[in-house]
A protein has these predicted regions:
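Membrane-proximal helix-turn-helix segments that form the acceptor-binding/catalytic region
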Residues: 38, 58, 65-70, 82, ...
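Conserved donor-binding/catalytic core segment of Leloir-type glycosyltransferases
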Residues: 112, 147-174, 187
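Nucleotide-activated donor-binding/catalytic signature segment of Leloir-type glycosyltransferases, i.e.
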Residues: 196-223
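Conserved acidic donor-binding segment of nucleotide-sugar-dependent glycosyltransferases
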Residues: 274-285, 293-299
Length: 336
């Protein structure tokens, strides 16, 4: 993956043991990340370090170690704060990870979280002082997204095919929808560990004419698919991972003027307002009813799509970037 970035951004690829296995590599990256981070810091005289947190990898731990050595502040951005609950050896692993994640976050100079729910979670679960936690939402470049063609019967999901996304719940609704609206299409963008099982489910239910797996799609192509759709699908399973989370894909749906459907208690209320820019549902049966309702009611679809477009303004990357700059300037001034 070679993203096109601003010429001022330099990518340094750090070799990591076990790099063919992402999860193992993420747990073995500390030494090389620390060593090279310190080297780069000494060469470039950075003002601060910015790191992205995830419960299973040690990059933020390496960032904190680099910050200590270089005597510069560390900002850590948290989106996925915790794992799903586990049993047996996995549960023991989670407990060990919680110990080092707690120490890492406690040593960070500023922790950025997307909302009040995550702020409280990071404070309670990792014992991080509320004084160092600030709310900075996720964002998207809303100018890149065109208003969707709300006259199509296309329902879209964009994202990783993980269990907690609940794509199986969406597939359970397909037959009910297609009986009522035979030409409806369910387009799935993305890849992941559940992909093959989901494909088996589609063939088993004989709904392959209405369900299209696109696999991994270049980010530049996503706006095109969204503009051809009428409904965006958010998280369809309520877990520790999805509860009150703010997936960027949902902001992209909103920027495209799509009504959104998601399982109750997943998306924050400033992203999905029930009956205003979409619906929260409780199961696949209610999901199918809401899809049918939206596809059959052009005016409702239009009004909800316009509400999504209006609500997404505060999540424009231009606004989010300003908040990150303010936080970094404050952290730098406090560290002097």
């Amino acid at each position: 993956y070679e993203p096109k970035l601003n010429k001022k951004i330099v990518i340094e690829k750090i070799d990591t043991p076990s790099k063919s296995n992402l999860k193992i590599a993420a747990r073995r990256c500390f030494d090389n990340m620390k060593k090279n981070g310190i080297r780069l810091g000494e060469e470039n005289k950075y003002d601060f370090i910015f790191s992205i947190f995830h419960p299973f990898h040690l990059v933020p731990k390496a960032a904190v170690a680099c910050g200590k050595e270089l005597k510069i502040p560390v900002i850590i951005k948290v989106d996925d704060a915790v794992y799903q609950k586990a049993k047996g050896l996995k549960n023991l692993q989670r407990k060990i990870e919680k110990i080092y994640n707690s120490k890492t976050l406690q040593k960070g100079n500023r922790i950025l979280v997307p909302n009040e729910y995550t702020k409280k979670l990071v404070h309670d679960y990792y014992n991080v002082s509320l004084n160092k936690i600030s709310i900075v939402t996720n964002g998207t470049e809303i100018d890149n997204y065109k208003k969707s063609d709300l006259n199509s019967n296309q329902i879209i999901f964009s994202g990783a095919m993980y269990h907690h996304r609940g794509i199986d719940v969406l597939l359970e609704s397909v037959l009910k929808v297609t009986k009522k609206i035979p030409d409806s299409k369910f387009v799935l963008l993305g890849d992941g560990p559940e992909m093959e099982e989901l494909k088996k489910m589609v063939y088993g239910k004989e709904i392959s004419k209405n369900v299209i797996f696109k696999g991994w799609v270049d980010r530049n192509e996503i706006p095109k698919y969204l503009s051809q759709s009428s409904i965006g699908i958010g998280p369809l399973r309520n877990t520790e991972v999805t509860r009150h989370a703010l997936p960027i894909k949902v902001l992209e749906y909103m920027a495209s003027g799509l009504p959104i459907l998601a399982i109750k208690d997943t998306l924050p209320e400033d992203v999905l307002k029930n009956d205003e820019n979409g619906f929260f549902v409780t199961d696949s049966v209610e999901l199918s009813k809401k899809i049918i309702k939206l596809l059959e009611d052009n005016e409702l679809r239009r009004k909800m799509g316009e509400k999504s477009k209006k609500m997404v303004t505060k999540f424009d990357w231009k606004n989010v970037a300003e908040l990150i700059i303010q936080e970094s300037q404050e952290v730098i001034s406090l560290s002097k």
